[in-house]
Swiss-Prot record:
Keyword vocabulary terms for this entry: Ribonucleoprotein, Ribosomal protein
Positions of the UniProt region annotated as Disordered: 97-136
Highest taxon in the source lineage: Bacteria
Keyword Isomerase part of the UniProt annotation: no
BP GO terms, sorted: translation
Protein name: Small ribosomal subunit protein uS9
Taxonomic placement: Bacteria, Bacillati, Cyanobacteriota, Cyanophyceae, Synechococcales
Basic and acidic residues bias: start-end ranges: 98-116
Leader peptide range in chain numbering: none
Similarity comment: Belongs to the universal ribosomal protein uS9 family.
GO cellular component, one term: cytosolic small ribosomal subunit
Residue stretches of biased makeup (Basic residues): 117-136
A molecular function GO annotation: structural constituent of ribosome
Length: 136
């Protein structure tokens, strides 16, 4: 960790979505996103949907150019990881100031999305797909 980062206030948040887990740090800066040591644009393949999803909690509070986002994320795909980062950033902003909680909660940035892959059941081909039925 740089000596510059040690002197600044660091706010932590953890986010989860599907099988992705993101540990997010907010550091006072100019709005850069760094995910697993790579730039956010590069890591997310320049996908504007994922980038806007990550920036959404900061935009809700009008802080998009005030904090750098440093992320360690693992598991799942890019969409799950982007939503996990979004939730982690929102939780870190709540740590920054308790007043931030209400606007973030009304926008839905703090709630965990419970949807996950349904398990396969025995006797079926997939989670709900049954083998073809033959009457005779």
């Amino acid at each position: 960790m740089n000596s510059q980062i040690k002197n600044k206030a660091v706010y932590w948040g953890t986010g989860r979505r599907k099988t992705s887990v993101a540990r997010v740090r907010l550091i006072p800066g100019n709005g850069q996103i760094k995910i697993n040591g790579r730039s956010g644009d590069d890591y997310l393949n320049f996908n504007p949907l994922h980038l806007n999803s990550i920036k959404a909690p900061l935009q809700t509070l009008g802080l998009e150019n005030s904090y750098d986002i440093l992320v360690n994320v693992f598991g799942g795909g890019l969409t799950g990881q982007a939503d996990a980062i979004k939730q982690g950033a929102a939780r870190a902003l709540c740590e920054l100031s308790p007043d931030n909680r209400k606007p973030l909660k009304t926008e839905g940035h703090l709630s965990r999305d419970p949807r996950a892959k349904e398990r396969r059941k025995y006797g079926l081909k997939k989670a709900r797909k049954a083998p073809q039925f033959s009457k005779r």
